[in-house]
Curated annotation (Swiss-Prot):
HAMAP family found in the cross-reference section: UPF0251
Protein name: UPF0251 protein VVA1436
UniProt similarity note: Belongs to the UPF0251 family.
Bilayer-crossing regions: none
Organism the protein comes from: Vibrio vulnificus (strain YJ016)
Top-rank taxon: Bacteria
Length: 100
């Protein structure tokens, strides 16, 4: 039985709901969902340029967990860019505290 997941502190939610290749209807493309904690990890590491330890403390998780989250997030974004998939983002109605 896996350990219960810790709640992750999410500092902001996106203004858009998805990103997709230009000129192709979204219903014709495969989708990859980016979770709220993955988006927050990208924001902390790549936008605010925090070190992993600082970002992990901000989210309320261990440095190793943060590393796993950011790795998953970057992989999803790269797949969407390289393979032309739709990247769906968490919507505004989701809780700021996310159980992942």
């Amino acid at each position: 039985m896996p350990r219960p997941k810790k709640p992750r502190t999410i500092g902001c939610m996106p203004k858009a709901s998805c990103f997709k290749p230009n000129g192709i209807p979204a219903h014709n493309l495969p989708c990859i969902a980016l979770e709220a904690d993955e988006l927050e990890a990208l924001r902390l590491a790549d936008v605010l340029q925090l070190h992993q330890l600082e970002a992990a403390q901000s989210m309320g998780v261990s440095r190793q967990t943060f590393g796993n989250i950011i790795k998953r997030a970057r992989n999803k974004v790269a797949l969407c860019l390289v393979e032309g998939k739709v990247l769906t983002l968490p919507n505004q109605s989701q809780d700021k505290e996310k159980e992942a």
